Amino acid sequence: SFFAEDLCVITDSVSNNTMIDTSQSEAVLLCDLNDHQVLYNKNSTEQLNPASLTKVMTAIIALKYGNLDDMLTASSNVTIQESGASLVGISPGDTMTLSQALHALLIASGNDAAVMIAEYISGSVDQFVELMNTEALELGATNCHFMNPHGLTQDAHYVTAYDMYLIFNEAIKYDEFIQIISSNEYTGVYHDAQGEPKELSLKSTNNFINGNHSVPGGVVVIGGKTGTTSAAGNCLVLLSKDSYGNPYISVILKCTQRDYLYDEMYDLIATVNQS
């Protein structure tokens, strides 16, 4: 398989560091991107709900096929009623650039922004979802299946931690993606249907970026994507670097509580300087 050349591959030979407590997380993966080594693997091929980690796939397609300066117009489908769904406040008729929509998608996890991007790229959410599944397969992510561009709970919408690594590994090839996920805050101005200005004010949902959780000494967290729903639990995919600047991707799916998510991810990435 041509995928294996520059990718981490799951083998039976991974001996997990027993000092790392991942008891509260269903699936955990740590990959060394330089040596293409899997350093920690727990249930990384189990199919689980990704929640908003889905938005990484949405971002890849936007960056691959879209133009950052293009102006997007929101349809009535940006009005999402589901309780607890994170929204940045986009209303039907609002216009913003693709760059602004990507910031809303990745920093504040805006589900409304996800719909706006999907309709801009493909004309409809359903057609965009077909593209998500096609593109995922092209990345070798063969054990995941998407039903929407945002990750709100839906039957037959799932990923594996390993597929999430493959998808995130593709996303970080885009400079704009890295710039956005590393941002704690973003402000911009977009416009409503009448052309009146609206403020876009975003704050990172990632506690390693927004300062709500400390980062291990000798480790730099570049950024990542959070995901939280009752079905998915607490999820996080992260790009970090060790004290030599070598990059790592770490994934946790279905952690029981947000505090445990960051504690277990902290323990996981703290080990990168020991290898």
Residue ranges and their predicted role:
Residues 2-162, 166-175:
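Active-site-adjacent loops and short helices of periplasmic peptidoglycan-processing enzymes
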Residues 2-27, 124-275:
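Penicillin-recognizing serine hydrolase domain
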